């Protein structure tokens, strides 16, 4: 029942992964506007009727600055979702779709205007275990190197989620104060992909 008490809720249980990924791709958020609420006020948990005291439904708009925007929809109100991309990124010269979920990645698709087709990048480690982040942490401690996702990044995501709740309460945008150094990723070559037929 603690899941539906203060400290729990959809933003902190589910949304945290989406915010962490989007901030990893696009950098720190500057401002948040959100609608956050409780659609299902009571739930049966462990055979008992439980009052839901936290959010179970949220739509969050993120302003990354420089006219770069994102949105996250999350909630315990979504019964099942299809095989649509988990994360979509749209830019001036193309688009990218993350396939699968953060915890079960299936690679990604990339559209580049110059290639004029979708390119599929298969998951590089399809047997990647969910707990492998712990191995990464241990490797970084042994090598005295920083982790890919830094503590500042996690703190920033926490501030974004709290700001989403505040924005919904106040009915206005909320500025974000924290910052973090954006992660650096290797550049992928088209040779690492295979082309897909685009029926459109």
Regions from the PLM with identified roles:
Residues 7-10, 121-125, 143-151:
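Active-site rim elements
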Residues 43, 50-57, 65-133, 150, ...:
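NAD(P)-dinucleotide binding in Rossmann-like oxidoreductases
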Residues 1-51, 171:
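Predominantly a Rossmann-like dinucleotide-binding segment in NAD(P)-dependent oxidoreductases
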Residues 19, 75-77, 163:
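Short beta-turn/strand-loop junction motif enriched in small, turn-promoting residues
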Residues 23, 30-33, 97, 138, ...:
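Structural signal for well-ordered, non-membrane alpha-helices
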Residues 139-200:
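C-terminal helix-rich "cap/oligomerization" subdomain common to oxidoreductases
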Residues 18-19, 105, 131-135, 161:
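A general structural signal for well-ordered alpha-helical segments in protein cores
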